[in-house]
């Protein structure tokens, strides 16, 4: 079994060795390279497919040979540098390949593609075969450049640097490619054979008959493919024809002669060097360290890449003339034909590739992006030679130059094994020394030495003379971190006076060592100038440098002209000539031939690395149009912004001398299309841009698929869960509403598609927009002034002919009301009489507002409100239309034509109503007559003839009566005729029975069509009532008469007939009441609603006023009393002055100033926050603010409240958490329980070592102080500034409150200190020690202790993010005023708010240039208090957003005086306030607090709550205060904390001071007239936002918001916008609910719902260096709750029970037993410094006994090896008294090449081009208990 396993293991290892061998890997990569098929296969396949016969066979062979030869040359070029440079020159393809392709295409296009002329039997003489060979060879060489090589082919270049035998790898990869190519060609041959043998294809007669035509067609297909390749290739080359040249004015600096000096070169070129063979094709190697020192800085940078004739050369390889002058180069006056051709055609300083221009807000040029850290070079790592791809290019170049001049024999003799052994021995020696030192320090602690003497201190430089004072931290080269600074060199005036300015410009200093190292330098100039100097003796101290010169001379003696001394002079060391030359070499300065005198210069030149920068400084299109660019920049932009149309919406009418285009206001209308320009530079080849894909119809931000993981909605799985839930419940509750919404959406989509089709139809017409615009203008004029007046005239003439009164006035009033507004193509209103810019090209729309419709008659205006309300509800039609080219009107641009209101429809409707009414009346009469006739015939006993006569008589009588009303004379004649034929008896009877009672209500005429619906109902009811009454009276009389004639009737019949009239009377009464109720109901309802509204609102006003007044009075009284009692106890004498001042200040309280800081902190607050909607938070916030402001307070009475673990009854949880976070209160730890945390062995191990938490006194001694500038020789100097209250550890409150008198404390404010420690401690603790489960909570308190309305879960039920996102989970920034901005992390997934528009529109008294140009030479202690804010607008009370408060650079709490603070002139009168809510008009001072304080009461800074402050800003001399204008994405306010480099004199002339610009902008932008104020008011309110809204979140809000914005733009351009505003509101075009959207959706709610995101302004808060010292000394931070203190050591401690993730610094932890001198174990973090700590870790990991452990992860190694590598731990087994297990220290160290990988990843993650961020990649050890 053992043998089998052994053989199996050998077999596996053998297979692994074979697989990892160079040959197999080369074959594999070569085979994969076969799939890199490009245009070179075009000629090869053509020869294989089309050629036939013997000549065809020869052509196939020649094509294959040329193809393989070309591929072999490409593989050789990978290793052979000259061939690679020859094929990889940037302009080779432009000069050679493109003309060859075009010539080949046009030459073969006019003749038969396969006709190569006459052929002979001799193949070598056949020109066609040679052409085939050359074509395949050349195309294979060009294949690498025509199309980008595939990823598989690029892998060859990567593996080249990982194998040792490179030539074997190249050969094997070529063989692999050849095998793959043969297989591919065999497959093609099999396919062709199958096609030829296929009967279905061969039997086609058409193909057989037209074989020659088919061949010609195939030839044409190949020609077309070749032409497409040429066209596609045209866009990928750096062509000088299509490349846009940047203007010379765009270059950085103020001179235009930058391009001429460096472009000159000679024909001499270094060949065959090792640098060429290694072939750095895409790197920009820095030059030698000994480059020219006084080269013009405005010229090209030293590290810039210079390509001439395709050879990448550094500046060292050029030949310059020796004598050049600053600002006056020799080649300044060259003409264009005197320059080299390539430098004339191609500008190497500009962007040919589609690179992104990274904005630089400083006055510097942009860093070149292609200067990456990927530079391959061999170096020694871990004692062995390895290839590093992050090697400094400048160092490699300098090393090669040194190696060419001198040999290093000592290093060459040693082998690699000996070097490695030496390296191991050195590391072991260092390891032993560190272990001994470490053990000595531990033993010293056990013997009882003072802890500060045991801890390792950082080495400092001191004064050599006195040895008493340290060198200042800034100038100490030993210190690291922020203490490292650049010393600003200054030349005394006496030295400057010695050197005249002319001589200073003419002289040029040349370094002599640089002259020695460069081979092409003329050394004869040296010999001519030796006699200028005096002969002095040679210094004996510098003899070792002389030997170096001798070695240089011997190594370079073979070269001509490089011999420094003659052979005779080389023998003696002390020869005079050698001494003379040595002095000349070190001290001499070459001068110009015109001036042979030696000039002295007292300028210190230090070695520094210059960052490679571009020669141009470009501006974006947005900056150019907004006027935010600097004065020194060009007049045109170079960076393309997002495509948009600028619409001028306001232009000043009165133009003064100072008025310019900048005063115009414009609206940017962005087209709804993807932004593929992406901040590209003009002239860059956009075709070369790859990695940008299109995966949906409209992409707002086009980006690479590499960033798809940062998108919230994935393209394939995008589900809006809340919206789906809403639709589900909506459909469950009611099916009809869901169907209705669905149908409306479908109709909208159909309308949009139809409008798109109409718009696309215009594109087929030549000049579509111009044609359509002219037609629209003609249609508008025709409609307004011809068509409509003609219709009005015809209508009124017709009314006159029909005997109706004309309506000239009404019609022409409506005609005048119709307005035609000219809009842009997208519908943005511009003006009524002015055409927009470029309207002839872009097109216009004409919007008809209040369109005129011809009506047959006009309704009466004197109508009741009820009827008008009903008519308005009935006639809800759009009040505007867009005019079409055919004269019709549409509601949308290019929409469908809706039906017009008809002129004859009301007339027909009125006739139909009258006909229906007449018909109904006739039917009623017939029905009544029928019923009465039937009843009468049943009851009466008379004959039918008598009854018919009586009925006819009554009917004739009724007709007579009606006729009498119409014409009395005709009735009189009829009456006489009738009376002549009747007897007197019947006449008397008829006269007696003809009386008919009229109604008691006067009936109006039914012909009046102006009666309302209510009047008609009343009239109908009155008619019916009067008719019924008449009938009942008539029936009663008839019954009474019949009863008298017949005698007494029966009882039953009499009672039945008696009840019927009673019932009729009751019905009459009910109808009468209903009539009155109908008439009075509407008025009653309106009066009732108004009365209730007034009563309730008055009560609300009185309650709010009384409560607010009582609240403020009680607060003032309580705190005045409290301050009075306290001051009487402490200092009775100063009470009167203080109280009087405070009372005066409280009277000057202004609530408007508090809203500024509140709204600013809203923008920086988190999303998941708790909301408070009760006003009691105001009083509690004020109470505890006052408590925290007092210097010393005894909180014994409040201690029980704060230490209560349950739900507090008298204190809100948020306020308690606030004071616990601020460090004011601390509660007990004994009731705190750990929830959902897994305790690892590191925490358990630290529980037994609590004794090593130093006390506050000792930690305060560790913190450096200002007076500790002397060297501590005998021990630590006692701190004399400590008082009793500071050393009393139990009373921590005194320590917190006496900061002003406590001089030892390093930071100026406890809050800032606590914040920094809180964030850094938490981050470091989580990164090293924490093991948090996915179900863990990060909040204030556990979920079980909080109720539903008290949870403040900042990461509650949220997926755990990366470790770097832990800073977002810290809720402490809700409670801080300053210093919290720099610690906020920006989420890259967000769409950020465009602050450019906000800041551009929000400022009224600002000069834009003042923000961009600041004074570098600011004075000391410059006060920028109130005067700094005069340039900003007064914010309105109802404003949506507010400005940012500029925080202090450094605060002085002692000098802060509570003065009335007029922040940004906020106490001025607000211009034209419009109250959108009535309840806010009664409380104008509470308007800012209306929506802010309810949501988050803690975000309002306590210092601005009920008092005002006057903040000061003290700017020191070394601090620069800059404001910069924002880019397209965001604004940066950067506070520079470092010294700038020396600027040029011309550059300083271009900068203006901040104070001068501030005075100018006050005078320039002052408001003078009322119209301007109205425009600013409108602009401030409704034109301050630009957001991206998701339609799924708030449906229909986007469209309504955009429509409102368009109306705002149109209103800004009007002189009197009030009337138009009212009319826009009436026609529902201006939505009032969006105007007051801030009352419905606060900024926090909008942020939560994802409508828009605000990017907070980053302020670089000054970072004090004391905190860095604390990080160095106390790295191991452990939370107090992680300790389990024994009972005998338990003392009173203060801890926050609600914050489980809070880490407290070590020096704040109270020591349980200070006099205890027993120490168990000390970790390296507590003793050694950071540098020594890292050194110890690395040396411990380098174990010479186990060589394999260097490149492996030691965590997976054997534990025995770990125990042996850490011997000092084995000796301390007895130290851990609580645990019996052994403590083992496991170190995790990555190999060196992994660190290089991290350094390369560094460039991607941090977007840096240098190694400044490499310090982030520090790997700390992990401690584990075995």
UniProtKB/Swiss-Prot annotation:
* Record carries keyword Metal-binding: no
Q: Where are the transmembrane segments?
A: 18-38, 67-87, 127-147, 175-195, 221-241, 774-794, 1081-1101
Alphabetically, which GO biological process terms does the record hold?
A: protein transport
Topology relative to the membrane:
Multi-pass membrane protein
Please list the residue ranges that the record marks as compositionally biased, kind Basic residues.
Answer: 1042-1057
Question: Keywords for this entry?
Answer: Chloroplast, Membrane, Plastid, Plastid inner membrane, Protein transport, Transmembrane, Transmembrane helix, Transport
Q: Which domain of life is it from?
A: Eukaryota
- A Pfam match is Ycf1
Give me the Gene Ontology terms describing cellular component. chloroplast inner membrane
Q: Where is the composition biased (Acidic residues)?
A: 252-266, 293-304
- Localization: Plastid, Chloroplast inner membrane
Say where the protein is mainly found: plastid
Q: Where is this region: Disordered?
A: 250-308, 1032-1057
How it assembles, according to the record, is: Part of the Tic complex.
Q: What does this protein do?
A: Involved in protein precursor import into chloroplasts. May be part of an intermediate translocation complex acting as a protein-conducting channel at the inner envelope.
Family, as annotated: Belongs to the TIC214 family.
Q: What is this protein called?
A: Protein TIC 214
